[in-house]
Amino acid sequence: MAQAVEEWYKQMPIITRSYLTAAVITTVGCSLDIISPYNLYLNPTLVVKQYQYWRLVTNFLYFRKMDLDFMFHMFFLARYCKLLEENSFRGKTADFLYMLLFGASVLTGIVLIGGMIPYLSASFAKIIFLSNSLTFMMVYVWSKQNPYIHMSFLGLFTFTAAYLPWVLLGFSILVGASAWVDLLGMIAGHAYYFLAEVYPRMTNRRPLKTPSFLKALFADEPVVVARPEDVRFAAAPFDEIHQD
């Protein structure tokens, strides 16, 4: 069993493995009181006035307490981050990392700006960790890039992947969780998808270009993909619970 887990971990692409590792270490460290969540959460005042810039990163690494909800989010992170990196961004590690950085920047900007809007500031002030929203962004992007894959939700009903974000959003509302986390992820995901996929087809211009320093860190690799015998190879059955 341990060997199988080790093999599964080693076979993960580098960005997925790095993010999953950092998230698990951070969350476990907080659960064991080795790390304090108060040193990790997003606080604009502390970032600007006390130069605690690490909070812009660490708030994406903490998935709250170690419970069943944490396990589900780790599953979502490992699954959809891996699917994107191995398929849509296969051989383009720098582009994938740039997508995550773009999403993190959009999410942070929304929370910071929302915190300055009357009547909305109180709601945005409660959003101090954006890890779940970034995970949801990956789910959204994957669903837009694979809209025709058939999925099943808890064996209750089937749908195509294009509706996956809405199914998860509906489930969050059904169990009484805040919809803000999912909505923010959908906004960030749609912003990326529009600028990276839709807008270039409309104007023949690409506003999102991966910076050269990221390209230098992760050079593009040539990809040779054998045609699968079953066209539904990438459509692993979806039988998951989503909670926030």
Curated annotation (Swiss-Prot):
InterPro entries: DER1 (IPR007599), Rhomboid-like_sf (IPR035952). The lineage of its organism: Eukaryota, Viridiplantae, Streptophyta, Embryophyta, Tracheophyta. It comes from Arabidopsis thaliana (Mouse-ear cress). Residues 1-21, 118-121, 174-244 are cytoplasmic. GO terms for cellular component: endoplasmic reticulum membrane. Its main location: endoplasmic reticulum. It is found in: Endoplasmic reticulum membrane. Keywords: Endoplasmic reticulum, Membrane, Transmembrane, Transmembrane helix. This is Derlin-2.2.
